[in-house]
Each structure stands twice: as structure tokens, then as C-alpha cells.
């Protein structure tokens, strides 16, 4: 029997749990939240769609009862607060680091062999924190960001090409941030044909720019962070692990010399399977892409340094 726990029953966490159930990724999905009744209510609401949508997954909600998460195969951490007006980067990291660290430690008490998928922001730094503080093998701690950014990239490519997003292949590497992500336009294809031969350089640059501000654009429209695509991206990563699909998915993972970088979690393509990260795939980047990746890594290192400043590591 397979089991997934999603911590945080807010918009992203609830969407992730809902997609996991609808796609019957696991036999049981547990949602845990600190707010009394929220996860229980959302779980009940979702279960009342089972007959309508035709899924058999059981969804359980609980308030801070980590015992109910016991023996989870994968745990997804969405907990944390958004950055508030006037809040410094260090303050946000300090608050969310405390939350993520506590959540991860409690989860592992009951599911010592679980694979951890991190969605909480700043995602690359929270993934690094979870890995470092728990002392787990690097294959078991994975940040979701690249899967989401790549999905947005494919959406904007499909809009420019006038095709279905499923007909496009595209990948985003680097940090999960609007100035650190690197949409790899050179490698994007439509039905096997390089997109660079189908779109003008100007149009392709527009697609890249739209991808990089994709999250910010949605925040401006919604008045809050997006949740459908982030939640679905988390579920997509979990599905590849639980079903041992061996998909190549860009995720934030610990590098130890790959791409010329070490001691940080950052987005690169990996093969996902039952062991979590089965393999890190090293792409042949050109000089411009290598320079952008190095700059992205430097920015992530700088953010990670704040973990020590606030005493989280």
C-alpha cells in the first residue's frame, strides 16, 4: 500500500493532494496542517468528489497529528509563510527555515525512509536546509521548482507556436526565482524540431522573459501566489517517484561537482524513480548557458548564507 503525506493544506498543498488523489498516485494521501479543521474539511470535501470523478484514493486530514503520517513513502512540504510587506529576505528565511526544519524532523520520526519533496519557498534554500539538517542521502531530498518552471516554459512556447503544450519539449534549469532560472531555449523542440527554427529570436526571447516572470505575473493577477500549477508540479514529481517512472524532470537537488558546482541545491535535470533521485543528468551547455548557470548558483549560495545568519544551520 502506497502512502503520501502533504504538509500544509493551503492552496498549493490542497491542490497537490487533490491531484494525487484524482490520478490515484497513492492508495492514501494524508494532509496535515496547523490550523484546526482545515485539512479535515478539505479532505472531506475532496472525498465527496470521489464518486463524481471516479477515484479510489483515500484522503485523510489531520491537525498536527504526525502519527497519522506514519509509514509514508513520500512526504511533500508546502509549509511556510509568504513574504510580507517590509519583511527582509533574512526574516522570511528565518521564519520559513524554522517551520520547514521542524516539519521535516517530525515527519521523519514516523516515516524514517520517506523521500522528501520540498515546495516551500525560497525553495532551493529550503531544500538545502532540509537535506543538511536531516543528514539524509542526497537522493531523498528533492525541490520541485524546475518541474513547475519547465511547465510554464512549455505553456508559453505552445502559445507562441499555436500548438498543444504536450507537443513541446522544453526545460528550465537554475534557481527557482525570476532572476535565477534559465529557460533553455536552444534545446526546446516542437515534435522533434528545434523551436529556434520555428520562432524568431525576438519571439523566443519574449517566451523566455514571460517564463521568468511567470510566477510574478500570476501573483499580480491573483493578488496571491499561484497554486494550481505548483500543486500539480509537486504531484507530478511524486508520481514519478511512487510509480518508479524514471522520468527526466528538472528538480532542485544537491550538486557535488556536477555542472561545476558543489554544496548547493539547484535545478538540474534528474531521473526520478523509487529511490528518489536515480541519476543527475549533465547537459552539454554552451558558454552563455554555463555563465548563466554559474551566476544563478552564486545567487543561490548567497541566499543559503542567510541560513547561517539566522542560526538555522
Curated annotation (Swiss-Prot):
Entry annotated with the keyword Transferase: no
| Gene Ontology terms: biological process | lactate metabolic process; tricarboxylic acid cycle
Q: Which reaction does it catalyse?
A: (S)-malate + NAD(+) = oxaloacetate + NADH + H(+)
Q: Where does substrate bind?
A: 83, 89, 121, 152
Q: What is this protein called?
A: Malate dehydrogenase
Q: What is its EC number?
A: 1.1.1.37
The reply on keyword Oxidoreductase is yes
Family the entry assigns: Belongs to the LDH/MDH superfamily. MDH type 3 family.
What is the originating organism of this protein? Bacteroides fragilis (strain ATCC 25285 / DSM 2151 / CCUG 4856 / JCM 11019 / LMG 10263 / NCTC 9343 / Onslow / VPI 2553 / EN-2)
Q: Which UniProt keywords apply?
A: NAD, Oxidoreductase, Tricarboxylic acid cycle
Annotated function: Catalyzes the reversible oxidation of malate to oxaloacetate.
Q: Coiled coil: which residue ranges? A: none
Higher taxonomy: Bacteria, Pseudomonadati, Bacteroidota, Bacteroidia, Bacteroidales
Amino acid at each position: 500500500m502506497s502512502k503520501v503525506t502533504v504538509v500544509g493544506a493551503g492552496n498549493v498543498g490542497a491542490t497537490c493532494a487533490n491531484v494525487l488523489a484524482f490520478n490515484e498516485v497513492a492508495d492514501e494521501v494524508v494532509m496535515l496542517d496547523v490550523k484546526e479543521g482545515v485539512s479535515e474539511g478539505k479532505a472531506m470535501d475532496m472525498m465527496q468528489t470521489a464518486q463524481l470523478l471516479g477515484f479510489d484514493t483515500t484522503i485523510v486530514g489531520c491537525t498536527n497529528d504526525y502519527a497519522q503520517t506514519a509509514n509514508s513513502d513520500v512526504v511533500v512540504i508546502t509549509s511556510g509563510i509568504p513574504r510580507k510587506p517590509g519583511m527582509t529576505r533574512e526574516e522570511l528565511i528565518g521564519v520559513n527555515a524554522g517551520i520547514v526544519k521542524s516539519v521535516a524532523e517530525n515527519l521523519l520520526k514516523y516515516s524514517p525512509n520517506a523521500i522528501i519533496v520540498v515546495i516551500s519557498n525560497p525553495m532551493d534554500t529550503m531544500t538545502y536546509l532540509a537535506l543538511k539538517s536531516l543528514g539524509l542521502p542526497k537522493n531523498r531530498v528533492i525541490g520541485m521548482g524546475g518541474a513547475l518552471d519547465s511547465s510554464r516554459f512549455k505553456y508559453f512556447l505552445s502559445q507562441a507556436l499555436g500548438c498543444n503544450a504536450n507537443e513541446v519539449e522544453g526545460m528550465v534549469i537554475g534557481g527557482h526565482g525570476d532572476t535565477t532560472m534559465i529557460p533553455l531555449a536552444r534545446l526546446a523542440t516542437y515534435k522533434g524540431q528545434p523551436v529556434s527554427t520555428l520562432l524568431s529570436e525576438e519571439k523566443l526571447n519574449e517566451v523566455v522573459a514571460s517564463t521568468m516572470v511567470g510566477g510574478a505575473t500570476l501573483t499580480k493577477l491573483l493578488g496571491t501566489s499561484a497554486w494550481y500549477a505548483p500543486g500539480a508540479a509537486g504531484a507530478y514529481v511524486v508520481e514519478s517517484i511512487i510509480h518508479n517512472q524514471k522520468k527526466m524532470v528538472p528538480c532542485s537537488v544537491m550538486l557535488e561537482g556536477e555542472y561545476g558546482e558543489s554544496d548547493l541545491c539547484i535545478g538540474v535535470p534528474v531521473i526520478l524513480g523509487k529511490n528518489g533521485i536515480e541519476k543527475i543528468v549533465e547537459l552539454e551547455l554552451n558558454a552563455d548557458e554555463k555563465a548563466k548557470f554559474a551566476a544563478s548558483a552564486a545567487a543561490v549560495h548567497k541566499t543559503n548564507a542567510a541560513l547561517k545568519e539566522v542560526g538555522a544551520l
